[in-house]
């Protein structure tokens, strides 16, 4: 019951309630993650307690921003093993979640999780971020683009902002020290049609971890030249 209590507390902290049914979905998800991780490299975090805190609770804390409660559509860019997209879909079944990843094996895992958990509000797409943003049905189509991928804000902005509708939001789940990174990404955010709105600190229950939600509002259309071709985004970030 320790994990259930921890997750309930985390959910309450962001104005949500975790039902037993939702908790059971998280446990099935955890078991699948551990099982698949033995054959596909999904995560370096493999212990029960670490998965609960560093993956599940960390993802649930995104709901500290009301945008995650109010949005109808969300894309999780470079979702990997499904964070934060799948936890968001479990906690809010009214949001349509698109999971985007460049590795087909991970997409197969995500499809299995979606099926086993009975998530009707999730679809997984196999694509690089740069390529997906050129598709008409995906470009500037989402209320929220989010990412917990390990890349700096300049790179993430070019990966994510092209997916966001005007007046929608790009919300990055980042680590504890983001000030310098934000400063360096100012030009990228502006160039891509965004405006920095807020940096929101979150704490992870029963740990000393502190993370940040970096919130960028999409205020104008993203120029058609972005995102650039695969490789250019990471090699030559907009500065």
UniProtKB/Swiss-Prot annotation:
Any one Gene Ontology cellular component term annotated for this protein: cytosol
Q: Where on this chain does S-adenosyl-L-methionine bind?
A: 78, 83, 129-130, 148
Q: What does this protein do?
A: Specifically methylates the N7 position of a guanine in 16S rRNA.
NCBIfam families from the xrefs? rsmG_gidB
Per UniProt, the keywords (alphabetical) are: Cytoplasm, Methyltransferase, rRNA processing, S-adenosyl-L-methionine, Transferase
The gene name on file is rsmG
Q: What is its EC number?
A: 2.1.1.-
Q: Coiled-coil stretches, from where to where?
A: none
Task: State the name under which the record lists this protein.
Answer: Ribosomal RNA small subunit methyltransferase G
Report the GO molecular function annotations: rRNA (guanine-N7-)-methyltransferase activity
* Localization (cell): Cytoplasm
Q: Which family does it belong to?
A: Belongs to the methyltransferase superfamily. RNA methyltransferase RsmG family.
Q: Name the Gene3D superfamilies on file.
A: Vaccinia Virus protein VP39 (3.40.50.150)
Q: Where are the transmembrane segments?
A: none
